[in-house]
């Protein structure tokens, strides 16, 4: 697999979970002998939802809720077959969304 690059994008609502997952991935890849670039923190996506507090007629009273999506990027340069196999077997938390590009 010489000259290839694997790009892993992680998304999660909790920054502690995403950081621990990125740390697990980096440790696994360095243990198998491939080079790692990252984890690179990407901009946090912030969605704000405005909801009327009262179910009836008071429109001036509103409440704001926000949802933050934290993102990280990890590049694996020159992965070995052992690296790919160990990444497939890696157990990560349920709250992390992973997308992999070759």
Swiss-Prot record:
Gene Ontology CC annotation, any one: ribonucleoprotein complex
Keywords: Ribonucleoprotein, Ribosomal protein
Listed Pfam families: Ribosomal_S10 (PF00338)
InterPro entries the UniProt entry points to: Ribosomal_uS10 (IPR001848), Ribosomal_uS10_CS (IPR018268), Ribosomal_uS10_dom (IPR027486), Ribosomal_uS10_dom_sf (IPR036838)
GO terms for MF: structural constituent of ribosome; tRNA binding
GO biological process, one term: translation
Role summary: Involved in the binding of tRNA to the ribosomes.
Family, similarity comment: Belongs to the universal ribosomal protein uS10 family.
The protein's assembly and partners: Part of the 30S ribosomal subunit.
Protein name listed in UniProt: Small ribosomal subunit protein uS10
Organism field: Planobispora rosea
Gene: rpsJ
